């Protein structure tokens, strides 16, 4: 897949997401947006010898993920969306997550993501998963 095909694919996905909306008020029209353009950005590719990652999203570390770093935790009280929101049990179990903006030292290469998908998060709906992956950005921390 060429870069231009990837960018077009990504733009199409964001346009669809923009029409659908994001967040808990999307059913009332909140969270919608328009995509005016997408350009490739290599801002994070120019980091020399990264030894840590910055998480751009809240996440739950997977076994074996780095533990040394600076971070804050939060409790996410999730609610199901779409057709599940109207069920008798629309809430997810509370989930302890690492907040976006956290930084963790790594040994070796920085991976594209950390964390994992959480199963058994909605008692009445075992098919529901909670996205708990970190979008990681390589950074260089001083010793």
PLM ranges: what are they?
Residues 1-143:
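Basic, Gly/Ser/Thr-rich N-terminal segments that form RNA-phosphate-binding interfaces in CRISPR RAMP
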């Amino acid at each position: 897949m060429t870069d231009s095909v990837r960018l077009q694919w990504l733009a199409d996905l964001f346009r669809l997401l923009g029409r659908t909306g994001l967040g808990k008020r999307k059913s009332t029209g909140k969270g919608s947006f328009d995509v005016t353009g997408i350009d490739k950005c290599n801002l994070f590719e120019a980091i020399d010898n990264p030894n840590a990652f910055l998480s751009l999203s809240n996440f739950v570390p997977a076994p074996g993920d780095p533990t040394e770093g600076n971070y804050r935790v939060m409790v996410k009280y999730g609610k199901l969306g779409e057709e599940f929101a109207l069920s008798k049990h629309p809430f997810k179990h509370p989930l302890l997550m690492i907040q976006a903006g956290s930084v963790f030292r790594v040994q070796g290469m920085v991976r594209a993501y950390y964390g994992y998908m959480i199963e058994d998060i909605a008692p009445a709906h075992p098919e529901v998963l909670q996205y708990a992956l970190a979008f990681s950005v390589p950074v260089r921390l001083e010793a």
